[in-house]
Amino acid sequence: MILFQYDFKIEFYGASSDIRYQKPKLVVETKQGAPIINIVISNEYSLASSLQCKKARLQLFNMPLNFNKSLKQGDIARIYYKKFAHEGDLDYRFIMIGYLGAPVDFDFENGDFICQYEVYLLSSDTFFDKKLDTKNYIGRSIEEAINLAFPGQAIIGMSSQDRKQIISESFYASTLREFIEKLIGKYVHLIFVDVGELDFKVDAKFVFINFDRPVGQRVYKRLEDFALLFIPQREVRFVGKSTINFWNATLFFTDKIKVGDGVEFIDRHGGVIRAIVQEIGASLSNVGDCTLKLRLYDESNILWMG
């Protein structure tokens, strides 16, 4: 049974750094289950697993035969949703904006025809070959180094101690790729490329997360407030001498939870579990349920080194 009737609006624009004054090439808006649209949001590893990047896959069913001719690789897709069919245009909420990959078409024996597109936050892998203005980071704090390499794009989810750590050994990087490779693992546990708050351009934010120390006065969002579908399931990993707990949670889709957020929930024994969102995925459809899947890193984990 579908509890919410989600609708979607997808606007397609020509490639541009700023689309606020552009008229979309095409607009696809669902009403009463037509056209059928499936959206899958997932995480893609890049730079040899050094960082995760949010991406989406669009599937549009039975569009006009010339639909793909109006779109090309590198065009921009802007995606919105609303939960109830009776809501107006002003009730649409922003999901993400990104660059289209090459279109893929599928024909099925029953006559259905699907146009499929990948939607990326970064224009291409060459993004990481961008030359840095500052190349030598010895003597700078981790926070200062990150903000120099990613001006206006960094969200730092690290403790004050980790932020203030001074780089005291060789740290020379001429490109973003080299910077990330030197940073990840040694100074930062996870770098996640997420969508920003802006909807008039492709606004990628780089989220830097460390798991082993508390981050100041973290605000915890109660998962029960977001229509949690079942009690999160624990997953145990063994890393060296450490036992690491993760939790997998599924809830109705919301745009209010992001990677790096603190969340809490009641486990099956009545205890309060606090965790950090490590990964997010979503399955969205205007003819089915829309769910958000979270992978959570338990804050009680203790990493034993050596």
Label the model's feature ranges:
Residues 41-72, 210-306:
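An acidic/polar, Gly/Ser/Thr-rich interaction patch typically located in mid-to-C-terminal regions
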Residues 134:
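Glycine-rich loop/hinge motif
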Residues 95, 114-116, 201, 272, ...:
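Short edge beta-strand segments in beta-sheet-rich domains
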Residues 109-131, 288-306:
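Short solvent-exposed strand/turn elements
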Residues 137-153, 172-188, 257:
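Polar, S/T/G-rich
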Residues 74-76, 139, 260:
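Glycine-centered loop/turn motifs
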Residues 107-128, 156-234:
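Short beta-strand-centered interaction patches in the first periplasmic/extracellular domains
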Residues 1-122, 246, 276:
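Assembly/oligomerization scaffold segments
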